[in-house]
Amino acid sequence: MEACRLCSLCRQIHHKVPGQGDRHAPLMFIGEGPGQVEDEEGLAFVGPAGQLLTRMLEAIHLPRDRVYICNIVKCRPPGNRVPAPEEAEACLIHLRMQTWLIRPKVIVLLGSTAAKTLLDPDFRITRERGKWIERKGVWMLPTYHPSALLRDPSKKPQAWEDMQSLRDKLRELHLYTDLYAPPGSPSPG
């Protein structure tokens, strides 16, 4: 990925930001693209939106280091603009390789760019967020991007519903059983 020159985004960046976390995680979060802080540090979701994502994970008792977090594009779009469809398309080879290597059972799509790129170009996050979609044995949950929640805090209750739904799906699929007891079984520990 470091040598990638498939689109023009790589020309004005400090770092490519492939993603980080548990490379064997059954849960993957996919956002839009790196922001300024991520570009400077070379790590995904470490700026204000990443700090909010960490708090959202903590709210459902899921340590951040137990999931994998990445973005559709691996280079920061100028001015933090939405990646162009051709930029997202160029980066899909990297995302496909990540999902193939990690093999998540559940993917949370953070924001409309991730949902439009991976589900449907006509996807509308305000209408379709929070609805589970199963593709090739992988469950996907589109929800608001944390940066959208920072811009519009009135969406936080819906995002909280989605996080509770995520927790319930992880229980249903018997994932993170050391953290979540499956329905009807005693709590671990």
Where are these regions (language model features)?
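A polyanion-binding, active-site-adjacent surface
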Residues: M1-G189
